[in-house]
Amino acid sequence: DSDFRVRSCILYTLLQASGEGHTFLPQEELTAKTSELLGIDKDIIEKNYMDLSIERKIIMKQSGDQTQIYSASFYYMEANTATMLRELDIAYDVADAEIEQRIHNIEKQTGMQLDEHQVQAVKEAVRNGLLVITGGPGTGKTTTINTIIRYFEMEGMDIFLAAPTGRAAKRMSETTGFEARTIHRMLELNGGMEGSAGFERNETNPLETDLVIIDEMSMVDITLMNSLLKAIAPGTRLILVGDINQLPSVGPGSVLKDIIQSEAFNVVMLTKIFRQASTSDIIVNAHKINRGEEVSLDNKSMDFFFLKRYEADIIINVVLQLVKQKLPKFVDATPYDIQVLTPMRKGLLGVERLNGILQQYLNPPDKSKREKEHGDMVFREGDKVMQTKNNYQLKWEICTKFGLTVDKGMGIFNGDMGIITEINDFAETMTVEFDEGRKVEYSYKLLDELELAYAITIHKSQG
């Protein structure tokens, strides 16, 4: 129980907690966890907090009758984030009538019809340097963003759109008709190792734009938020859009939720479910679950079915029928458009077993398809795979069908999905094509970072 060992274990426990999404732990919980790891008395741990605090390795904060203990880096990240948000929160004086007239013109041009909350969101966006727009699925966030984009376009402003994941950025591009990038791409990631990867865009080289709109904010953790804000010069407008009821970020900190709960910034909450969304039982039921109401399970629905089965093998047969026959027939979905989700990794209905079965069924062995065994897994050309950790050094490129490179960059992230297009035993490489046509060549040494993705855990699906 040397002091050095105790202190190292305290810092290790805080680091583990950050991997579970926490920027701090209550003192009692930290003491209990450290004591359990080291098998020593709690008093010995308690007396080391002061020394760590003096060395500025941890920060102790009183909140009500609870002491919260942060690792210093996360504490300062949160404090700096709050300061930078305040600096962006500039008020602009624009007359109501002027904004309303312009909204009316946009509605006429586009055929969109805004409700009062959406109009309020546009007004707040015009009058404030920083705005948060939040609401559940189907509440018109996209229509609101589209109106805001058109409004500022008429002002001749430069607008950047971004989202935390490749898939969210692709979706944002489709719904707005403007190019959206991942936040990492917008900030121009340079390939360091995970801890030291930096961005070319920062406080000394900020983004050259008038307005930044970030979608799917619930997935942004404190580390990425801090990097983003450093790259936004005061005077640039920032609009954050998201749904706080979605799963929080995998990384530490519930940034969106904390910004809203602080009540320090302008927030517009969209609550009305629009007509086209109110015919979607997925959206209606999501709102019911949020309100703690019973979900309607009649299987006349077009998009929400509940099939009750009790034995693992029977459940698997139902899934196989759906994926292979019923869904392709009824909704014209290819097996790659269908995602099977399960809560666990191990067991009869875990990711590992399901992937083996689904692969056998959807992409069976074939003389024309090369494969590569890796641990318990077999990768085969045509397989659907997922990247399982952030790799800032992986190079990708986007090519035309004639092989000309049109774009290239670095970084493939936890949760990115793609298809294996080529396995080359001679070069010991496997090529995977991700969203947006980004192709990456993996050396066989890196195959630990990939897994089959016919079935994935619910936790991984949040991107």
Predicted regions located by residue number:
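Accessory, non-ATPase domains that flank or precede helicase/AAA+ motor cores in DNA-metabolism machines
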Residues: 1-101
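ASCE P-loop NTPase helicase motor core
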Residues: 24, 119-122, 127-300
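Residue-level signature of catalytic and energy-coupling elements of molecular machines
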Residues: 30, 78-81, 125, 138, ...
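Conserved nucleotide-binding/hydrolysis modules and their immediate coupling elements
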Residues: 35, 110, 221, 356-462
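Long, charged amphipathic helices and adjacent flexible linkers at domain junctions
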Residues: 90-108, 368-375
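Conserved pre-motif I regulatory segment
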Residues: 101-130
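Conserved helicase motor core of P-loop NTPases
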Residues: 244-410
